[in-house]
């Protein structure tokens, strides 16, 4: 965003504009929402930019330096919607509020202006409001710090829930670490902006990157901020964090502190996630497998979208997190399977649980908004409803549960948290059925909850009844049946009569009682001492009622802060139950099965299916062809390297992807769409399937392909699972074949991992004969009356041909081009046979290079010694004769 700080000034600004310019100068990188009464106003370039993004009217207010000041504004009560559009447009917004009323300002002097101050800076990674946040997606704000030893630290928080993770990682794995989180914004030190790893991250991250001064990213500043935020004298209680981790924490907390503008930071103490206990997925693999983000950038068509059956927002976020960071812990995965199996075994119980969960609002975000002072009565009602719905779900679960579900049921049943149950029940009684969003609107405390409030309301409501009686009295007194008692914010309560009937009230004797206030085109307005006195009593009663409700609400907020810990545990249990139920529902719908975990690095699947492709085909009323796969990295029960050949469109890429997705699903704790699956856990999944240019970094399609292949060959271990499709296709045939051959050998001989390698280089199929742990498979295709039919079935052995010309015909190439391609193919296939000394390469040997005679060498030497620029015409002619003699051997 361009810097929109204070413009140059040659004239003295007004006090109001001086106040604006002073505040704006403190926030040059953000649009300034400047509160003026019922509007947030923007000025100068801020107004121009906001008007363009929001499609609102751009006007002007006064002059500065002899020029009109551009101005645009939005109503404060509808500000959240406008903020959401600005944030989506890549803006940061500083929200500047009035810190006092105009009446309070006047007490300081008749010319005093209202004091204002920035209360918050709204950025993509620091959102908390419902209207600004996608309910079913997480929102991670991350910060990175680097050490000089090839190590980096990643601090990640979610301001909307309070989660805070802090971990050190090898700097080379930064991409994997960043994409394992639903990143909304990344904070870096300005000193690190030109690091190659940061430049690379700019290429694959969709989240904005914010730079902060280098002094914010030091271990010393991190330690100081951690002590300040968590009220600690020493950091020992937080755990054994390194200096680079403290630096990352400091950078993150510094930014959160900046955006909250002095408000308390409400994060939980940092925890170190077990990065060694998760399945690592690099950026290229995550993109090609479309786990939670499609190639087009949306959610549709992703693995997450297809399997998601959650009914709560926290459950949806937890499911996404587990797909992004699958586990490597056998005990953790098994406990997740046990929960799914139990729910899957009782359809009635499963449905009853989901009915209760559907009525549970977003507890963790409601609690955080209340703790941040941004919540309202609706958040309080959401808290109560979520806690009580969870208790009902626990009651449905009953007894005889596997350990993980038993723990969830105990937490949700509130047997260990009686104070939480009591508070939730109190809220259910205290709040009206449909409370307003904001506490200042009032009317959210139910009748009968608070005696003092009921008394004030009785006075207020009784006075309103008196107003109705006064209207009848005044109509009778004046003889004007059209007389009405009305209210507005300027006049308060007043009497209004049609202008045509107002004359008697303007003359004695009625004028003695009715005081003229305002004459309008069609009406005249009056007041009376009696009405003014009653209006004062109503206003005071209204103010007292709102003040009492605010006091009750603040007491509730204090209780929420006291119970934040147990409420966070309950929110996590609700999400856990929702995810288990989601997996059970999806398994019931699709016939997905529980994987059998094996301590050995095997992958043995029967009837494996691609969940996303199958779902798409099902919508079209078509079936999916399931296939088997058997890999063993130790080579005891079969090949660890499978080389797959077959025509384009036959299903090779689908076969590869469904295998990798099965690993991710299984290690996330979900069941897998197959007849059966026996699986040894993987440490990493690699996918090199499909590629495109990366023009921003000057990389061609082939360069991208080679970078991704290099990453796999350099990083895959015997516990990894690798899929590669068409390695080498982006360059010349023989270069590509050589690269594919070398890559296949390296995977088999050096990496020794489970790998599926799809190729059109049929010469590579002979590798299975010389690599002991390799085997061939192919996709079936049949020709029928000159048409090609894909059977999508995987069979043992290599394919005999690629059917490229037939696929070109299916793609719609002109008939003449297809016919010509067929003719050329026949000639090529009838060419010379393979060279004996390169048995895997069907290449034609080149003719031997001609040898030079001594005479030729002498001619060349003479030419090399000549300087054409220095020769005279006579010397040049002599050289020609000499060369002729040399060529004859003279």
Curated annotation (Swiss-Prot):
GO terms for biological process: mismatch repair. InterPro entries: DNA_mismatch_repair_MutS (IPR005748), DNA_mismatch_repair_MutS-lik_N (IPR007695), DNA_mismatch_repair_MutS/MSH (IPR017261), DNA_mismatch_repair_MutS_C (IPR000432), DNA_mismatch_repair_MutS_clamp (IPR007861), DNA_mismatch_repair_MutS_core (IPR007696), DNA_mismatch_repair_MutS_N (IPR016151), DNA_mismatch_repair_MutS_sf (IPR036187). Keywords: ATP-binding, DNA damage, DNA repair, DNA-binding, Nucleotide-binding. GO terms for cellular component: cytosol. SMART domains: MUTSac, MUTSd. It comes from the Bacteria. ATP binds at residues 646-653. GO terms for molecular function: ATP binding; ATP-dependent DNA damage sensor activity; damaged DNA binding; mismatched DNA binding. Belongs to the DNA mismatch repair MutS family. This protein is involved in the repair of mismatches in DNA. It is possible that it carries out the mismatch recognition step. This protein has a weak ATPase activity. This is DNA mismatch repair protein MutS. It comes from Hyphomonas neptunium (strain ATCC 15444).
